[in-house]
Amino acid sequence: MNRRHFLHTAIASAALPSLASAQEVKAKAKKRILLRSSWQTVNIGDIAHTPGMLHLLEKHLPEYEVTLWPSSVDNGVAEMLMKRFPKLKIMETTAEAKKEAFATHDFLLHGSGPGIVGQKSIIEWTEKTGKPYGIGGVTWSGGGTDKGEGVKVISGGKFAFFRDSVSLEMAKAKGATSPIMEFGPDATFACDLVNDEPAAAWLKEVGLEDGKFICCIPKLRNTPYWEIKKGVKFDEKKNARNEEMKEHDIAPLRNAVIAVVQQTSMKVLLCPEDASQMKLNKEMIYDKLPEDVKKKVVWRQDYWLTDFAQSVYNRSAGLFGNEQHSPIMCIGHGIPAIVCRYKEQTSKGFMWKDIGLSEWLFDHDFDEAEKGLTPAVLAIVNDPESAKAKAAKGKAVADDRMKRMMDVLRAELEA
């Protein structure tokens, strides 16, 4: 064999393993993920679950094709998702489209949510396909009256990540036995949707400068869906509970707003997470402020989508209030955020403890916000560098746990 022929043969032989492994990777990459998510569009946090999970998949499993199986992507949400994720396929909610998706996808990933929102979908997937599934970043309160169905669904999954440790312990206590059950934060931490140009223009229009305002969001004990979603009947019991507790729950926010304006140079933005809160902000905070305080408070009168809101939060000094997802969106971008919780919100607020932000968690059921909220808000305003450092630590914990979730998913896809 002459030298040239030897070299050619040797090089070709050496290339074979890499070619083979490349073909194997390509073959594995053909596996498709069906993401069950996008629960509703009247809350920017419920919207944010999906782009957060899509960003994680894009970052950690870029070679896999993803199709979204939504409940709702109306009100401009589909367009917003496609703008950020142009390769995304959104399944039509028809029997034919579902049948095709079931046949052509290999793994069902249930996205983040206030529970196993797509529990019936998981059962249908399992019964019709026998293919694997996993659950990523949910709160779980024990299944309620589902006669053990939730435990079976958790146990049948290849993995189940819970977005707060209380939910994780509940699943264990109820006897759930998925091979991997761990703390895995809400995928909203990974949401990177922004709409900078319109957001910056609006802030200029209302006189808010970057880093010189803090955001505030109120919330009732029960979201009044009868006001913001078609077909939802008025709930007299929930409405009565809202009326009973709204001054108790929102007065600490109002007091913090007044303190910020009177004791610092900061302005305050009263903004919504869901479509009912513009009215709530006006009724319970803005209209009850002293006239001199109102001059440095901006009340946003319109609902907004996740990308616009994120761009505003990113330009703020921080956020506080009775909501959960806007604080998650903030921490995900290194912006300080305080959560005030109560039992009607389920256990999701405890994820603040799980990511090391206990000092920024206040429980209305124990009147913690009444005493501690204003000092905590003022501390963020008066020492922004320390506050941002604390936010960064919380973000790092969330990022690490979300990576773990993606690593587990990859292992299942490549098994």
Kindly give the residue locations of the regions a language model identified.
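N-terminal secretory signal peptides and thylakoid transit peptides that target proteins
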Residues: 1-14
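Active-site anion-handling motifs in enzyme catalytic cores
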Residues: 11-14, 23-415
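Hydrophobic membrane-targeting alpha-helices
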Residues: 18-19
